[in-house]
Swiss-Prot record:
This protein's name: DNA binding protein ORF8
Tree of life domain: Viruses
Function, in words: Mediates ssDNA packaging into virion, it locates to the internal surface of the capsid, thereby displacing the internal scaffolding protein during virion formation. Additionally, protein ORF8 plays a role in viral attachment to the host cell.
Chief site of localization: virion
Length: 38
């Protein structure tokens, strides 16, 4: 299950773990779990 998700969301994972992730976490500190996952 994780292999398929990694391959399907491979580009999104990079964007999520990018500088945008820090900005989103700062904007939504109340939802750190959702921001980190999405």
């Amino acid at each position: 299950m994780r292999r398929k998700v990694k391959n399907t969301k491979r580009h999104q994972w990079r964007l999520t773990h990018s500088a945008r992730s820090i900005k989103r976490a700062n904007i939504m500190p109340s939802n750190p779990r959702g921001g980190r996952r999405f």
